[in-house]
């Protein structure tokens, strides 16, 4: 209170926060992310997605639990759709199931993939082979969803620039799934 946080927050959020929430809801109504997630994963998803708009979350969209994720208040609609397409996929398959275990067994023998796991900048996360598989499969699937919904980034640019280019597996999986 003494630091003036309430006034700072009111100034930072501005008078238009409720308007922004309504704009986001209205803008997203024409994007059926869940339809594509169900189609590509074979899983059922709840029909509702909860987006929590925050002032200080850039540059990330962050899954909290279930189908709730956090994102910056001022992200555009395309970014919001891409975040929803990605975050709700975690994990893309049961990571202790036969498909993931078989993939992990194969990937564990791949020198390039294991070098990426060991040597990439740890600030990007994904410090285990399981983490890389989980993330990169989500990225490949979210790219397909974003393309279907008309909000995709260029995949070559995305994977060359993002996280110092560590998502080689995502690019390969995307190529196989297209």
Language-model features: locations:
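Auxiliary, metal-adjacent structural segments of Zn-dependent hydrolase domains
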Residues: 8-64
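Second-shell loop/turn segments in exported
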Residues: 18-27, 71, 123-129
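Soluble non-cytosolic domains of exported or imported proteins
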Residues: 24-31, 79, 83, 128-132, ...
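Short pre-active-site segment immediately N-terminal to the catalytic Zn-binding motif
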Residues: 69-84
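Active-site recognition of the HExxH zinc-binding catalytic motif
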Residues: 81-99
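Post-HEXXH active-site segment of zinc metalloproteases
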Residues: 95-123
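Long, well-structured alpha-helical subdomains associated
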Residues: 119-178
